[in-house]
Amino acid sequence: MMASTTSATAAGGAFAAAKTRAGSSAAGGGACARVAAGGRRRSGVVVRCDAGVEAQAQAQAVAKAASVAALEQFKISADRYMKERSSIAVIGLSVHTAPVEMREKLAVAEELWPRAISELTSLNHIEEAAVLSTCNRMEIYVVALSWNRGIREVVDWMSKKSGIPASELREHLFMLRDSDATRHLFEVSAGLDSLVLGEGQILAQVKQVVRSGQNSGGLGKNIDRMFKDAITAGKRVRCETNISSGAVSVSSAAVELALMKLPKSECLSARMLLIGAGKMGKLVVKHLIAKGCKKVVVVNRSVERVDAIREEMKDIEIVYRPLTEMYEAAAEADVVFTSTASETPLFTKEHAEALPAISDAMGGVRLFVDISVPRNVSACVSEVGHARVYNVDDLKEVVEANKEDRLRKAMEAQTIITQELKRFEAWRDSLETVPTIKKLRSYADRIRASELEKCLQKIGEDSLTKKMRRSIEELSTGIVNKLLHGPLQHLRCDGSDSRTLDETLENMHALNRMFSLDTEKAIIEQKIKAKVEKSQN
């Protein structure tokens, strides 16, 4: 995929539109269509950051109609194993492709990531897996032994978990494969695919995926390396482009939105309530301070986290209220920020109706700003006359500020992304020949051991001392190593010589043919067979 420049808003329902006009672009069977230089594709959508709004809309419409989405393509692909190595893929949805109502049904709490990874890697065609679930996205990264079968299994897993029919999910899911999947992760880590372009919290979330995956054992060598390289890319982009300067985060956008909805004359006197003292909640307090707020009430399950925030932030009065007093605290607040991991709503229409009215000076409306996924505040709360609800999908009007400057920096960031992508691809390409190297060594060693045994029998082992036997074994090993040195040198693909990847792969295939070595395709099929047998036991 060519260099991309900004996070694109993928159009829901792209699959249906693509079916009728995508025949020519789908030819060739590639999972991901190429896009024009300076563009970016997500579910068949390309956006250029150097184009105007009208040009962007036109580009989106053309790309959507001209591309068969990967999820549609995998359904019509030949249902057999065609690749010689496993495929890396990402499948998921984000704020760009799906509403919060759908994202919250698929959200996976951080403490459940290891369990999700274990379930995914137990699928017949999934070798490695990682889950990245935040308020703005739910993405599953996998190494699939068969990419079309593996993706089908992942979609079925997502459908079963969320209760959403697979056909409905496909209207909002995107899927990327191999280098496109890797580039996407690098862009996510760099903040280029965020609702808030350049925001920094996503990098910490990518780091947490690595820590969580290492504990569960699901991050095999491919995904582990890919995520670590994504962290490197994210750090480089922030250091070398300064893209985060002036950027807003979800928490700061939430504060900004609340202040936009309050009467200007009453912004600083509004009574602020925060429910949840986690990372996002802490950032809400930080940005309230930056806006001049002098007091905030914090409701949390335990007082320890609130004390830690109070100790760190001396410029604001923080009042702690236990969770049992949440509704009493809400009755005394003009603005309620919610940021908890609760999977059920904390506030329903009935709760909001029971709260007292707000003074006319504050606009007569209590504001609920919900930055949790799953949502902490039911959408029907807005049906109450003196209440309004805003969730993460409502932050878009805030993040437009300073966007043009960050888009220019995003273009600079693509150079770094491409450099890190090439490094990862070179590393992965170097693994291509590893199975052949192992099989060739094993083949040669079997012959060596067999011929050595014949030789020792002819000589008579009783007539040999231990030293003589060891010398003969070392001689046979040395001869094999010398003979293999040349062929194995021609299988190196680490950039240490002038050989291209194509030349190295030609050498690999030649050795496989000459020595009748098992192909990597056979190894993949053996892995699948082993997983199927294990699941049946």
Swiss-Prot record:
One of its GO terms (molecular function) is NADP binding. The keyword Oxidoreductase applies. Substrate binds at residues 134-137, 194, 199-201, 205. The record marks 184 as: Important for activity. SUPFAM superfamilies: Glutamyl tRNA-reductase catalytic, N-terminal domain, Glutamyl tRNA-reductase dimerization domain, NAD(P)-binding Rossmann-fold domains. It catalyses: (S)-4-amino-5-oxopentanoate + tRNA(Glu) + NADP(+) = L-glutamyl-tRNA(Glu) + NADPH + H(+). Keywords: Chlorophyll biosynthesis, Chloroplast, NADP, Oxidoreductase, Plastid, Porphyrin biosynthesis, Transit peptide. The active site is at residue 135. The keyword Membrane does not apply. Its EC number is 1.2.1.70. NADP(+) binds at residues 276-281. It is an enzyme of class 1 (oxidoreductase). Pathway: Porphyrin-containing compound metabolism; protoporphyrin-IX biosynthesis; 5-aminolevulinate from L-glutamyl-tRNA(Glu): step 1/2. It holds the Pfam family GlutR_dimer. Gene3D superfamilies: Glutamyl-tRNA reductase, N-terminal domain, NAD(P)-binding Rossmann-like Domain. NCBIfam families: hemA. Catalyzes the NADPH-dependent reduction of glutamyl-tRNA(Glu) to glutamate 1-semialdehyde (GSA). PANTHER family: GLUTAMYL-TRNA REDUCTASE 1, CHLOROPLASTIC (PTHR43120:SF1). During catalysis, the active site Cys acts as a nucleophile attacking the alpha-carbonyl group of tRNA-bound glutamate with the formation of a thioester intermediate between enzyme and glutamate, and the concomitant release of tRNA(Glu). The thioester intermediate is finally reduced by direct hydride transfer from NADPH, to form the product GSA. This is Glutamyl-tRNA reductase, chloroplastic. It comes from Oryza sativa subsp. indica. The lineage of its organism: Eukaryota, Viridiplantae, Streptophyta, Embryophyta, Tracheophyta.
